């Protein structure tokens, strides 16, 4: 059995009394003071997450733009240096290998940020794609790129919440007010290279900082000493992302779930040159997907968990819950679910089977709480 990994901040989490649990191959903090308190801190003030378990891959070389566009559903070519893009890597069937962020430094250099649970799979898949024939090559040659796997040497913090900008500038002494949503810049922190972006996974304004482990350790210590930023675990990271309808790989996304089914086709640019999964997604978009990801709101106070059955009014199973909570911000029992497309219209009455009892629910938009990003 493979040993659980630890981030550079592991000892600090333990010292703070965090509840630790395995996630994506790492021993990670689930909560410190409690999920509700940490969730509310991010919604109203500021919280910091150790997200050093995420994976990072550098792609460089003269074919870097074409290669990234070949493995990535969004279009990096028109993006300007300093821009981040969200999208997916797709298999030939249109299923999602992973969802990720791409940071464009220039036409010849990109950073790909991938999910912790998929690091090994993604790295192998990306390296395999290097040997594919470049569709633009008249000679039928593979891509001329270098792929550097840097997950082991890059650590990451996410500072999130309406007070994040003030905290980053005043506590960490990092100028960030110039960054707009989904942009980034390269900076120096005590002489060390770092990257800061105005991105996050909470539905609130915030920043993600990538740097060497010793730099991230020092930033964490400053934040803790300041008392202006609550340490937050992965428990509230999940409740926060869920409330604003952001997907989690393994729940709303998977190798056998397509962007059409997950309602993410706005991040699949079918008009760009050939890329992995394009034909399958194009065909499904034209024909219509058999399943669709929807929101559900329950009438009663109950918690629908991942995998629970969704039923129609005739008690026939028509889908399953991908994520469900009693929403902390809205005080409603809600869920995201993958259901038969015939039952996906807003307002459709359905049921969720929780243990041996069924609870009535209604299909609603899957964004249960309004995002508060700074544009």
Predicted regions and their residues:
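Conserved thiamine diphosphate
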Residues: 100-104
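Conserved, structured C-terminal
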Residues: 1-24, 28-30, 105-375
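Conserved alpha/beta core surface patches that mediate binding of polyanionic ligands
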Residues: 80-96, 177-190
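Short amphipathic beta-strand starts and helix->beta connectors
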Residues: 35-44, 90-99, 141-143, 188-195, ...
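Short coil/turn segments at secondary-structure boundaries
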Residues: 55, 59, 92, 97, ...
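Acidic, proline/glycine-enriched N-terminal capping motif
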Residues: 1-87, 95-97
């Amino acid at each position: 059995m493979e040993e659980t990994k630890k981030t550079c901040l592991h000892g600090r989490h333990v010292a703070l009394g965090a509840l630790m649990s395995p996630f994506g191959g790492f021993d990670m903090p689930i909560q410190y003071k409690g999920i509700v308190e940490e969730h509310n801190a991010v919604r109203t003030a500021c919280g910091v997450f150790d997200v050093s378990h995420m994976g990072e891959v550098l792609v460089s070389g003269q074919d870097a733009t074409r290669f990234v566009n070949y493995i990535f559903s969004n279009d990096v070519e028109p993006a300007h240096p300093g821009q981040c893009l969200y999208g997916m890597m797709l298999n030939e069937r249109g299923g999602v290998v992973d969802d990720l962020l791409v940071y464009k430094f220039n036409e010849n250099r990109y950073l790909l940020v991938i999910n912790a649970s998929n690091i090994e799979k993604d790295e192998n898949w990306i390296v395999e794609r290097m040997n594919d024939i470049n569709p633009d090559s008249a000679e039928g040659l593979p891509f001329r790129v270098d792929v550097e796997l840097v997950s082991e040497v890059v650590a990451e913090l996410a500072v999130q919440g309406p007070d994040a900008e003030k905290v980053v500038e005043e506590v960490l002494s990092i100028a960030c007010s110039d960054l707009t949503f989904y942009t980034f810049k390269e900076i120096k922190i005590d002489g060390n290279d770092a990257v800061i972006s105005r991105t996050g996974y909470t539905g609130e304004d915030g920043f993600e900082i990538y740097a060497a482990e010793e730099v991230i350790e020092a930033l964490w210590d400053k934040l803790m000493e300041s008392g202006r930023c609550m340490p937050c675990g992965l428990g509230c990271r999940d409740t926060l992302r869920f409330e604003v309808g952001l997907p989690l790989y393994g729940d709303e996304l998977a190798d056998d779930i397509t962007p059409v089914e997950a309602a993410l086709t706005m991040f699949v640019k079918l008009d760009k040159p050939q890329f992995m999964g394009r034909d399958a997604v194009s065909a499904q978009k034209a024909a219509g997907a058999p399943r669709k990801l929807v929101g559900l709101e329950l009438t009663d106070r109950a918690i629908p968990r991942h995998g629970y059955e969704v039923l129609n009014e005739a008690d026939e199973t028509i889908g399953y819950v991908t994520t469900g909570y009693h929403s902390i911000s809205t005080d409603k029992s809600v869920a995201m679910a993958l259901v038969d497309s015939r039952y996906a219209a807003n307002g459709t009455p359905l049921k969720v089977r929780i243990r041996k009892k069924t609870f009535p629910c209604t299909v609603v938009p899957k964004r249960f709480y309004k995002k508060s990003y700074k544009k």
